[in-house]
UniProtKB/Swiss-Prot annotation:
Belongs to the Ap4A hydrolase family. Hydrolyzes diadenosine 5',5'''-P1,P4-tetraphosphate to yield ADP. This is Bis(5'-nucleosyl)-tetraphosphatase, symmetrical. It comes from Hamiltonella defensa subsp. Acyrthosiphon pisum (strain 5AT). GO terms for molecular function: bis(5'-nucleosyl)-tetraphosphatase (symmetrical) activity. It catalyses: P(1),P(4)-bis(5'-adenosyl) tetraphosphate + H2O = 2 ADP + 2 H(+). Its EC number is 3.6.1.41. It comes from the Bacteria. It holds the Pfam family Metallophos. The keyword Isomerase does not apply.
Amino acid sequence: MSNYLIGDVHGCFDELKALLAKVNFDKEKDTLWLTGDLISRGPQSLKVLRYARSLGKALRMVLGNHDLHLLAIHAGMRKNNPKDHLTSLLAAPDVDQLMDWLRQQPLLQIDDDLKLIMTHAGIYPKWDKKTAQTCAQEIEVALRGNRLPLFLDRSHTQTPHSWSPKLKGDARLQFITNALTRMRYCFSDGSLDMTHKEIPEKVQDDLYPWFLLPRLLEPEYAITFGHWSALKGKGTPKNIYALDTGCCWGNELTLLHWEEKRYFIQPAYKCENEF
């Protein structure tokens, strides 16, 4: 029984299957963890979603910002951009069932036995484990409720930048969503910067990658995340693992065999501009 953790797939189905073949993944005994953003940009988002859904209990995934964007398109709250390569997915005969399945997925995975946490973007530095769990559950309730379109319509904003336990309503949900699915940089006071995506060496001195700020999270827990392909899996402290290595941009898809702490790489078959 092994736990395999893979970064953002972004519709790169062939690379996903090739990577799983390298480790002889067996859904009857192994567990596949996915950091979110299963879809968009790559050419085979529909196949990725169908495969992920078929894994049943062998899959532990989290939702990413692109997954939430897809739900918003399907709910009629945003427009489909053909460049995202989602048109065939949205026209699929089983799209409603796939979207119902997708909205049931969590934003946070915690395994207390493995001392392992996964989110798409990371863990906000001012949250401990209990706070992160509570906040993620608030978004999950909103996604599964009958006000889904309204939540999705209001969730994709840059503000508020600062966290307070006293945040309420839309502002609270917006901050939590951003922290779990879009966060990269913070200022020293913990407020979010939602504009910069480049590597730390190229940003202003008063910005810090979220994982370099002092954290309230219990130190025995490892954090795995995706979202930030520019890092190329590098520059994180011990026990923090960046797994998005930009397969959809022509780079590679990365798998981490958790028990062995061993990486496996599958180069992209095509670069994004060729899809």
